[in-house]
Amino acid sequence: MNIVDLHVHSTKSDGSYTPSELVEHAIEKGLSAFALTDHDTTAGIDEAIAAAAGKPIEVIPGIEFSSEYEGRDIHIVGLYLDYKSDFFQRRLVNFVNGRIMRNQEMCRRLQEHGVAITYEELVSEFPGSVITRAHYARYLLSHGYVKSLKEAFDRYVGDNAPCFVPRKKITPMRAVEIILKAGGIPILAHPILYHMSSARLDKLVASLKEVGLIGIEAIYSTYAPSEEREIRRLAERYDLCISGGSDFHGSAKPGLDLATGYGRLFIPEEVLVNLKRKHAEMKAHPEAFRRNKILFTDLDG
């Protein structure tokens, strides 16, 4: 049976494989398709698609948006985006500008804590990448300030560390709307990782469904069988498609491999077939997927 992976990161955000290397690794692993879902950027998609040309692998254009809901970081994956559309690229510029401001302030704080770093040096060390905290951690490790990536997060850039600066984020509802307007399939990523009560998670999913959520990540690298069953029940309750992904980052997540996660992950191609069927319905009848109070009028603001 063919397998797929619908949640994968490259060097264009915080992964350690280039988009081209991901294609080769996916072929080695026997995948029929994978989605490149870098954080807040589509910069690696063209390279991945070009690398896959003429090879037995499909590269699905995707993204993973960071958003905030009731004080928690919530991620929304988008698949089959019209990522080159003017609308979508304008939205990404806003995300990039927000990250630049955050990163400049983090560099200033690191300098105050004895780290010789400038934003320009950081960007030059990771050309073409959306700078995330993983890049800071790698910089600190390679320049001898820490002995491990974990130490970098604990001492400098983790959530409770002195040099961390939170970014202003959109709501997950807004992320769903942006993905829909870009012609994509919005999916709630790894809901178990948010450590919400069942009632609170149900409330979040209901709110997202109201604005057009299509899928939910019910198959994921770290889920226990009981957790997968919980999310599958939630998907059934709200008539959502099942999605699945490893959240592969390469060396940034040691022991977690593409498609197989920590060894137990299995995402059958049927998952992608169902999502493709839903996507075809969306394109054929777009009005049916804009009936639930989706407010596109102010999305350029």
Q: Where are the predicted features?
A:
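Charged catalytic cores and adjacent phosphate/nucleic-acid-binding surfaces used
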Residues: 1-31, 43-84, 92-95, 147, ...
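Phosphodiester-processing cores and adjacent nucleic acid-binding clamps
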Residues: 68, 105, 109, 116-117, ...
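Flexible, glycine/proline-enriched loop segments at strand-loop-helix junctions
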Residues: 89-98, 123-126, 162-163
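Conserved phosphoryl-transfer catalytic core
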Residues: 97-124
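Conserved acidic, metal-coordinating active-site core of Asp-based
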Residues: 126-191
